[in-house]
Amino acid sequence: MTHEHHAAKTLGIGKAIAVLTSGGDAQGMNAAVRAVVRVGIYTGARVFFVHEGYQGLVDGGDNIREATWESVSMMLQLGGTVIGSARCKDFREREGRLRAAHNLVKRGITNLCVIGGDGSLTGADTFRSEWSDLLSDLQKSGKITAEEATKSSYLNIVGLVGSIDNDFCGTDMTIGTDSALHRIIEIVDAITTTAQSHQRTFVLEVMGRHCGYLALVTSLSCGADWVFIPECPPDDDWEEHLCRRLSETRNRGSRLNIIIVAEGAIDKNGKPITSEDIKNLVVKRLGYDTRVTVLGHVQRGGTPSAFDRILGSRMGVEAVMALLEGTPDTPACVVSLSGNQAVRLPLMECVQVTKDVTRAMDERRFDEALKLRGRSFMNNWEVYKLLAHVRPPKSKSGSHTVAVMNVGAPAAGMNAAVRSTVRIGLIQGNRMLVVHDGFEGLAKGQIEEAGWSYVGGWTGQGGSKLGTKRTLPKKSFEQISANITKFNIQGLVIIGGFEAYTGGLELMEGRKQYDELCIPFVVIPATVSNNVPGSDFSVGADTALNTICMTCDRIKQSAAGTKRRVFIIETMGGYCGYLATMAGLAAGADAAYIFEDPFTIRDLQVNVEHLVQKMKTTVKRGLVLRNEKCNENYTTDFIFNLYSEEGKGIFDSRKNVLGHMQQGGSPTPFDRNFATKMGAKAMNWMSGKIKESYRNGRIFANSPDSGCVLGMRKRALVFQPVTELKEQTDFEHRIPKEQWWLKLRPILKILAKYEIDLDTSEHAHLEHISRKRSGEANV
């Protein structure tokens, strides 16, 4: 292991890396550029910026400049790409590529990191395959010497996919997609208020010429009435169907209709469906007041979301490792994301599958196009179809009664989870009840039936509309059992944080005494702290992360103006350091103190010395995050006092406790979508479990697998019995014993210029896309 530790620090000595951004810009590209530069320098390599994409590579000169550590400071929170991007005709010609090769060889650069879409990455692969021919041409014409040719005998290429459309196969999320969704959802939320005031129908056109991802996720995240995407053209009688759907929604009491259209939407015959066509149809047939909004380039703009900054940073680190470990025999690869795992995939395999999708759509093999888009896309489509197109049955014969509740502290996205649970339950023909104020409400009988429109418009609302309490059930088993019988509750969906999980464990224990508690239940993790065992992510954490990030950006801006100032910021999370660590990565913090990574006074001293050194450079500001319970003695005040004293005359310190604003705000697209899918998945499981446990006219479920936590684990959504998770829990500190994100902490330290050892054994290995497709669970 130690051999691997030290290998990373010397991996790049004598090597040079060039980084360029090409094609359409995407938010988060700067985070990737910053990570490539800093990790490159950390490994001992020289790193060069190529300005203006491939055009800069062809033109050379001042377009290729060496980067320094400080030259990527304050880049993280900027949208677009700071080093510029351009569509380049010259590079498509061999002559242009010859000039590009000449520019690289002269600078001794043999590693190229390309951040762009599939066109940019295909170009890079062509460049690599021609490399030796280009060198021999340059040598023949006397532009380079034999020695230079030998030194640069092969070119390593790694691609990072930067595209807001998420149209690249083999990666769950491309850099920029999440931020584009943020822009779209901000606009949808704004339009919703005006549409409701006037009872209007809005047709929103979003980007995506060949890929409907943005349109699909937007419609899931805002509960749209209809979505048009290129991969799944509507049936021939769609006009009838659409108008019927819109009038049904109105008749149920809704004051607005939202229709989302991807710019590349087509019908079954390949004829484009435009926003204007839809508007005219609705006006002509239904006479509704209908408006069209084309979002356009707004979607590419603005600040990158926390997700994109972390994604860009992680991918940048992985790209440097892939380049420096590359040999003439390793294929050009793409670094991508699967679940929350970084993976390396052969570049041309991904490009090929991406082209196959386009071909399948051109040849109208739409089912195949949908399959090739991958499991995440398919899932979104299935859930959308269920929620938007299936009508609840009229009769409730043979139906079961399922109750939904919130437990713990409020988290953004809880309402979205309640909405999808209730609606999927109704679609399956069940009677759905909602419980107010958690287990306390269950004991007091604060329970009512929820119909379809009860949860209308809940997706985008923050907090908990049902009301939530931290009270655990044990003390009130008597009353809870009585109410389970009284309301004939046959299944329980518990949406909440650590208390929801411990409450689940108590219900399991209580089954021995109370038969009434022998009903299936499922816990959907929803807490800003992300500390529920059995899940890598919980609903609400992404929203909190973005809130912290936005605040840190503003604070950094203030510090940059004041100069020589260090801010100490306290985040929430109980004992769980997820928010502090991830926000540290996303906001470019100098340090993040957390409970899981114990620190001593010596560590605090090292950090102060580090900041003293930093103040000597051009970057005269510091940002330090501290999780609220990271250490009972080294409090925020203690750290602030220590920094103030030690920094006297060099920097001054300020502290900020962010507090409960981290629980509020409207949910981010990630949390809305994640909560909606979790609710649907939980309800499908519940229906199956109730049928399994139904004997002699009543429900009796006492097996361990009838009480589960539904969690996201690496690449799949899985149900795990609460009793099995007991072993994996540190109950005193309310955290799981093992947490995946701890391995991202070294990245935070390296990007903040600490000389630490990076364990490269955890890095991604090359996988193959075809094998990847078949062996995966459906999230």
Swiss-Prot record:
Positions with a binding annotation for ATP: G24, R87, C88, G117, D118, G119, S120
Post-translational modification: GlcNAcylation decreases enzyme activity.
Annotated glycosylation sites: S529
Keyword rRNA processing on entry: no
Subcellular location: Cytoplasm
Amino acids binding beta-D-fructose 2,6-bisphosphate: 470, 527-531, 565, 572-574, 628, 654, 660-663, 734
EC id: 2.7.1.11
Catalytic activity from the UniProt record: beta-D-fructose 6-phosphate + ATP = beta-D-fructose 1,6-bisphosphate + ADP + H(+)
Annotated stretches, region: Interdomain linker: 390-400
Keyword Chloroplast: no
Binding site for substrate: S163, I164, D165, R200, M207, G208, R209, E263, R291, H297, V298, Q299, R300
Active-site residues (renumbered): D165 (proton acceptor)
Cofactor(s) named in the record: Mg(2+)
Protein's recorded name: ATP-dependent 6-phosphofructokinase, muscle type
